[in-house]
């Protein structure tokens, strides 16, 4: 067509998905002048299990701004390919160490400060450890620290109230009695509760009722993310409430040890969440689909990856976020059902505890954790003076 016309890219084929790359030279749709060219970088994926053929076509509109004429059987390319975790790391100007730290020692004890890699449920995750100074983020008018780049390329961050508010947010303080009440059944182990008195593990941990810790961060998320217009930047992600057992049945009032406690004692953290029922997500694609808000809290494994052990230490970036002179913070990781009570791990004085005798004599904070899209950060170097910014 002569003149200026609208253009797009279409595709057809069985079990085919086509997306455009973040760094494509030209937009995937727009207008083009007669005799000019557009260069679009595409990602083509076979979503089936056998070989297939993809057909690509330039889609044009009539002259003088007419709408695109999409042939029957063709789909317009309009979705951007998500950045991989490694691409996000590089885009932020960061690099990682291939070393695997000894998690029985604090980051201060073995000098492991920086970015390291570990597998999660979605791929390779890059996590920050020790006294790092390059993971500061400014988002929604608040300060955050990056915990890790998730395996799918989204960026997991924890809220840091001190730089902007100068104090802890008291609405996030959850009493130990509230967090675990009524405490008398394995059903109350978790981010959401199941049905007490059940005879099966599935019903016991059926995720039917919010815990106080979930209510606290959900309400905070509504007020500070949804109501301020920033939710479009937030990605769905897995928040792991690992209720897999290593001893006992996890049913009724049976004495039960849960795997996060075992990993704390053996210093063997993981970023993988074994059971789909424990992967708290908003959609059912990644996990259980039980979240109504795209927010969770940190796990005991993530605190270990950050540099903590059961020994008190202030030499890691989560220390000031999770501790103050009076209170610590809850994690999302259950420890046990024992002596008729429910116990989850907490962080106090910089140490991560699996002991029920320590966490339940105090009120602790539920500190919100969210994940933003991998391409949401557009400026900054990640330092406290020049944090990464989402605009």
Residue ranges and their predicted role:
Residues 2-12, 26, 30, 34-391:
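Long, domain-scale functional regions
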Residues 22-23:
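Short, hydrophobic beta-strand segments
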